C-alpha cells in the first residue's frame, strides 16, 4: 500500500512528510484487511482503495490547507464510515480536533482500533446519529467546521450540521462537477437554518476535479432542526428528485 500511495502521489506537488504518508498507507492497509471481514467500503482492491480513498482524499485535504493549516479547530465528519475523509484530514493537519461520527458500530470500532494503533490524540470516534437528541445537546454550537462525504446532498448536510456549528462556523460540501442544482434547491432552506452561502472553490489536480462549497452559520436555527431522518429524506432527498 505504501508503494501504491507514493507512486500515485509522485505526479502531484504535495508537501506531505514521510510519516504522514506512512500513517495514511497504514490506515488504508487496515481498511483493506478489515474489508475482507465486513463491509467497510465498496472498493475491494488495494489499487482502488489507494486511489479512491487515499489519493483523492489527500487532494481534498490539500484543498483545505488555507483554512486548516496551523489552526487548532474543532471539526466533525458526519457519516465517516471507515474514517474517510476525517482521519486522513487528521493525519495531514494533526493540530485539529477531529470528531468522526457514524451510526455503524463495526465501523466505529474499526476506527478506534486504528486510532489506538497510530497512537493519535485529538481524534474521537463516536457511535451516534447527529440528529439524536443526546448528541445535539452535547455538541450544540461546538464545531468550527462540519463536513461529510457520506451525506451527499447539500440541503441535507446543511440541516444536519447547522445546530452543531458555532456562529460564524462553516459547513463544507465536497462536490465534483454536478452541484449547481443542489445549490439552487438548498437556497429555500437557508434562512430557516440560520445559514448563508459563502463561496465555492474549484480545484484541478491533473485528472481530479474538486469543488468545495461553503456555507456560513449566521444565526441559531429553530430547535425543531434537524428534523427526524424520515422527514429529511422525504422532503430533501425524495422531493429533490422530482
From Swiss-Prot:
Descriptive protein name: Ribosomal RNA small subunit methyltransferase G
Annotated GO MF terms: rRNA (guanine-N7-)-methyltransferase activity
Keywords: Cytoplasm, Methyltransferase, rRNA processing, S-adenosyl-L-methionine, Transferase
Residues reported to bind S-adenosyl-L-methionine: 79, 130-131, 149
Enzyme class label: transferase
Keyword Methyltransferase: yes
EC nos: 2.1.1.-
Any single Gene Ontology cellular-component annotation: cytosol
Record's keyword annotation contains Transferase: yes
Major localisation: cytoplasm
Described function: Specifically methylates the N7 position of a guanine in 16S rRNA.
InterPro entries: rRNA_ssu_MeTfrase_G, SAM-dependent_MTases_sf
Organism annotation: Mycoplasmoides gallisepticum (strain R(low / passage 15 / clone 2))
Stated family: Belongs to the methyltransferase superfamily. RNA methyltransferase RsmG family.
Protein localization: Cytoplasm
A Pfam family recorded for this sequence: GidB
Lineage of origin: Bacteria, Bacillati, Mycoplasmatota, Mycoplasmoidales, Mycoplasmoidaceae
Amino acid at each position: 500500500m505504501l508503494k501504491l500511495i507514493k507512486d500515485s502521489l509522485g505526479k502531484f506537488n504535495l508537501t506531505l512528510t514521510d510519516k504522514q504518508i506512512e500513517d495514511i498507507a497504514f490506515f488504508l492497509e487496515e481498511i483493506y484487511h478489515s474489508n475482507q471481514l465486513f463491509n467497510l467500503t465498496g472498493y475491494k482492491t488495494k489499487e482502488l482503495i489507494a486511489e479512491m480513498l487515499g489519493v483523492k482524499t489527500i487532494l481534498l485535504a490539500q484543498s483545505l490547507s488555507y483554512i486548516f493549516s496551523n489552526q487548532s479547530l474543532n471539526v466533525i465528519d458526519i457519516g465517516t464510515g471507515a474514517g474517510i475523509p476525517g482521519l486522513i484530514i487528521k493525519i495531514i493537519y494533526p493540530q485539529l480536533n477531529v470528531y468522526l461520527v457514524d451510526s455503524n458500530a463495526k465501523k466505529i470500532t474499526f476506527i478506534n482500533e486504528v486510532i489506538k494503533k497510530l497512537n493519535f490524540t485529538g481524534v474521537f470516534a463516536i457511535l451516534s446519529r447527529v440528529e439524536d437528541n443526546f448528541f445535539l445537546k452535547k455538541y450544540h454550537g461546538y464545531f468550527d467546521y462540519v463536513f461529510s462525504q457520506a451525506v451527499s446532498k447539500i440541503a441535507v448536510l446543511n440541516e444536519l450540521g447547522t445546530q452543531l456549528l458555532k456562529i460564524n462556523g462553516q459547513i463544507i460540501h465536497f462536490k465534483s462537477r454536478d452541484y449547481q442544482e443542489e445549490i439552487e434547491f438548498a437556497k429555500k432552506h437557508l434562512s430557516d437554518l440560520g445559514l448563508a452561502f459563502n463561496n465555492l472553490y474549484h480545484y484541478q489536480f491533473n485528472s481530479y476535479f474538486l469543488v468545495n462549497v461553503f456555507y456560513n452559520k449566521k444565526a441559531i436555527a429553530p430547535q425543531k432542526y434537524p428534523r427526524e431522518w424520515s422527514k429529511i429524506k422525504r422532503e430533501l432527498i425524495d422531493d429533490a428528485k422530482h
